[in-house]
């Protein structure tokens, strides 16, 4: 077995959050600046930290904007679900003795609030959130932190994500 560790991104990979993220961001921008930006123009925000997305949108007070975005996100929680087949996949990987982990752009608080309620976090031994590293995707730092904490060889790690930021992060870390 070439890989011992299978590491996942969360949003767009394990859980379907696209609608919730984009619409709550759209609502946040409108509330802060009055600008109405189509969701299609906000897709760049998928896969990077909320703070980085807000900076790209030239929002000055990102701390307040994150609070507002989190509040707005709660209006869309009914639109978030685990992708079909994920629970079965995780069970199968566990039965095959893979060690599973997470590398996400979510903060630890967002991870706890947005992901843990789905009841699948127990499948993952090592979890790296945005506040665990100073640099974020597409920088290699989050995956390298996973390699460090899991005490493994980077060649035994496979990273699965859905965005260009995920693939670039893995590439920058020398991970498949």
Residues covered by each model-derived region:
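Glycine-rich phosphate-binding loop signature in dinucleotide/nucleotide-binding domains
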Residues: 1, 95-98, 150-156
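Conserved SAM-binding loop
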Residues: 14, 82, 100, 135, ...
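Helix-loop "lid/cap" segments that line or gate small-molecule binding pockets
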Residues: 28-29, 48-60, 114, 146-147
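Active-site neighborhood of HAD-like aspartate-dependent phosphohydrolases
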Residues: 1-44, 56
């Amino acid at each position: 077995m070439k890989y011992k560790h299978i590491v996942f991104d969360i949003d767009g990979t394990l859980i379907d959050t696209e609608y919730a993220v984009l619409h709550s961001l759209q609502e946040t921008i409108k509330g802060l600046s009055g600008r109405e930006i189509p969701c299609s123009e906000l897709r760049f925000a998928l896969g990077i930290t909320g703070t980085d997305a807000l900076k790209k949108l030239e929002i000055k007070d990102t701390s307040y904007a994150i609070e507002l975005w989190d509040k707005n996100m709660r209006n869309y929680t009914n639109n978030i679900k685990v992708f079909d087949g994920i629970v079965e996949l995780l069970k199968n990987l566990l039965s095959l003795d893979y060690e599973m982990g997470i590398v996400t752009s979510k903060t630890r608080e967002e991870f706890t609030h947005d992901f843990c309620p789905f009841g699948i976090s127990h499948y993952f031994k090592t979890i790296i959130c945005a506040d665990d590293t100073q640099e974020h995707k597409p920088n290699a730092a989050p995956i390298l932190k996973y390699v460090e904490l899991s005490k493994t060889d980077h060649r035994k790690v496979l990273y699965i994500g859905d965005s260009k930021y995920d693939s670039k992060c893995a590439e920058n870390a020398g991970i498949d």
